[in-house]
A protein has these predicted regions:
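Short, glycine-/polar-rich solvent-exposed loops and beta-turns at beta-strand/coil boundaries
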Residues: 44-46
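Glycine-rich phosphate/adenosyl-contacting loop at the front of the ribokinase-like
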Residues: 1-16, 20-25, 32, 51
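Ribokinase/PfkB-type carbohydrate-kinase core domain
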Residues: 18, 24-42, 55-179
Length: 179
């Protein structure tokens, strides 16, 4: 979202942060670059999520992620006016673990499509795909116009042995895949 806003585009963030220092900094920094940010701030003690990313010189990444309160995304968090006003809805696969989050994804996608908008999904990592393969396949086939994934994520999604087979499968399922 910050990249889109930094290049002059309009961007909005739908999600959750806590009323803690990381949530405050996250919100401040998004707003500072022009991202519309009205997050859900749930009651309770679950802190704002965080992630440490290590990138090696050969461009491999290792991530240590705690999703925190962001994992509590639910349909009530989806601002329909924001989704309807956007051109592309971008959904983060890491948030797909809970049943309420799955409902939120489907709801947001339905709102986007009802307003003629495109829906995109990032597969996030192959372990995430392994956990949600059947649901992701259904989501990709039924709701997703643009799919973001890497080599390993696509192989996992389609349970095939070669990248060429994965590419052929994704071409059948969605309009555009960004690998």
């Amino acid at each position: 979202m910050t990249g889109v806003a930094s290049f002059g585009g309009t961007a909005a963030y739908i999600g959750k942060v806590s009323s803690d220092s990381l949530g405050d900094v996250f919100g401040h920094d998004l707003r500072a670059v022009g991202v519309q940010f009205r997050p859900g701030r749930p009651d309770g003690d679950t802190p704002t999520g965080r992630c440490i990313i290590v990138v090696t010189p050969d461009a491999e990444r290792t991530m240590n992620t705690y999703l925190g309160v962001s994992s509590l995304l639910c349909p009530a968090d989806i601002d329909e006016a924001t989704v309807a006003a956007g051109k592309v809805l971008y959904m983060e696969g890491y948030l797909y673990d809970r049943p309420e989050a799955k409902e939120a994804f489907r709801h947001a996608a339905a709102v986007a499509h009802a307003h003629g908008r495109q829906v995109s999904l990032t597969l996030s990592d192959s372990f995430c795909v392994d956990r949600h393969r059947a649901d992701f396949r259904s989501l990709v086939t039924d709701e997703v116009d643009i799919l973001f994934g890497n080599h390993d994520e696509l192989l996992s999604l389609y349970e095939v042995g070669s990248f060429d087979e994965a590419v052929a499968a994704v071409q059948r399922d969605c309009h555009l895949a960004v690998v």
